[in-house]
A protein has these predicted regions:
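Conserved GNAT acetyl-CoA-binding A-motif
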Residues: 121-132
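Conserved acetyl-CoA-binding loop-helix of GNAT-fold acetyltransferases
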Residues: 97-100, 106-123, 141-146
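Conserved beta-strand-loop-alpha-helix junction that forms the acyl-donor binding cleft
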Residues: 131-141
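Conserved catalytic-core motifs of GNAT/GCN5-like acyltransferases
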Residues: 132, 145, 150-163
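Glycine-/small-residue-rich active-site loops that bind phosphorylated ligands and cofactors
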Residues: 73, 88, 105-106, 136
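GNAT-family acyltransferases
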Residues: 1-95, 156-168
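Short aromatic/hydrophobic contact patches that present stacked aromatics
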Residues: 2, 97, 130-132
Length: 168
């Protein structure tokens, strides 16, 4: 599995994955799009701007949009890495949001996606990474715990875990 920034060449597989999320009415944490007016090429441009901190909406921070892909290039899920925390992110969303397309859940992709995302936090010198999940999401909780998450507290139904990213 590979976690990387989406490219123009990934359009078909990413759109297919987005359609699967929409059809199943499944949450797509770590992947953000306007279902009414979505244009893939504009989404790629917006992702680049968000990473550089350009044209950020109020209360947003610079972030990197990733997509995970299997060995044949099929899109598996999203991961969004926020490069710093504001109050809302500190209380609810954390540094990383991620999700795996419904048909590929339960196969270890969420753990691998989060592990690769944590390697990026290390490269970005984020030593303690906040990852959150709903109290009603035992699968995400298990992934976070398996990657070293330590529960700090629960706020309004959101479990907040810190993961220490060691320098090697």
């Amino acid at each position: 599995m590979e976690l990387r920034r989406p490219r123009l060449a990934d359009k078909e597989t990413v759109l297919e994955m987005m359609a699967e999320f929409e059809k199943s009415q499944s949450a797509h944490d770590g992947g953000f799009w306007d279902t009414e007016n979505f244009v893939y090429e504009e989404w790629l441009e917006t992702n680049m701007q968000k990473e550089m901190g350009i044209n950020l909406p109020e209360n947003r921070v610079p972030s990197i949009q990733f997509v995970s892909f299997d060995d044949v290039g099929r899109a598996l899920g999203f991961l969004n890495l926020r490069l710093r925390l504001n109050e809302g992110l500190l209380n609810y969303a954390g540094h990383i949001g991620y999700s795996i397309r419904p048909s590929e859940r339960g196969k270890g992709y969420a753990k691998e996606t989060l592990c690769q995302g944590l390697q990026v936090t290390k490269e970005k010198n984020i030593k303690r990474t906040l990852v959150t999940c709903s109290v009603n999401n035992p699968a995400s909780r298990a992934v976070i715990l398996a990657t070293g998450g330590i529960l700090e507290d629960v706020r309004n139904g959101v479990e907040r875990y810190w993961i220490e990213v060691a320098n090697e």
